[in-house]
Amino acid sequence: MSSDAVQTRLLDAAEELFYGRGIQSVGMDDIRSASGLSLKRLYQLYPAKERLVEAYLERRDGRWRDRLATHVDTAGPDPLARLLAVFDWLELWFGEPDFRGCAWINSFGELGGVSATVARHAREHKDAFREYLRGLVRDAGRPDALAEHLYLLAEGAMVTAGIFASTAPARQALGAARALLA
């Protein structure tokens, strides 16, 4: 098996377990079992669990941002439609069968107080999302302050959807976003 295939298999297993069960409840032996790799190989690739957590958050961040941007691009050139498409995408994401909330909020809640690495990744992800929204708001010719309001709507929807396993918070946030844009 190629090095890339081993890495993919390992990160797939780690992501499924970390996101599904929480980081602290998953041991390296759980990841070994799920990935089918030896514990020796696992520790060769990631000598510490925190490094595997970091790789998981980095990979998930890239995929999350790509999926959001791809969906927003399907809204076409209209700046307001693109901005509102963020909330449409949140509803799609919240409706995924394995949705368990925001991986960065969950990770920060578990480890943000004891892991500077996890705290940094959570902040970087949230800052990137805020900046993405700010860009969409500017493209729509609206004031930067609106981006902060929309950001808080989206973040609140993420937390609520994760807790209640519902897509309704995305629709409610979309309604509030429309009111702010009116």
Predicted regions and their residues:
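Hydrophobic alpha-helical connector segments
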Residues: 55, 69-98, 150
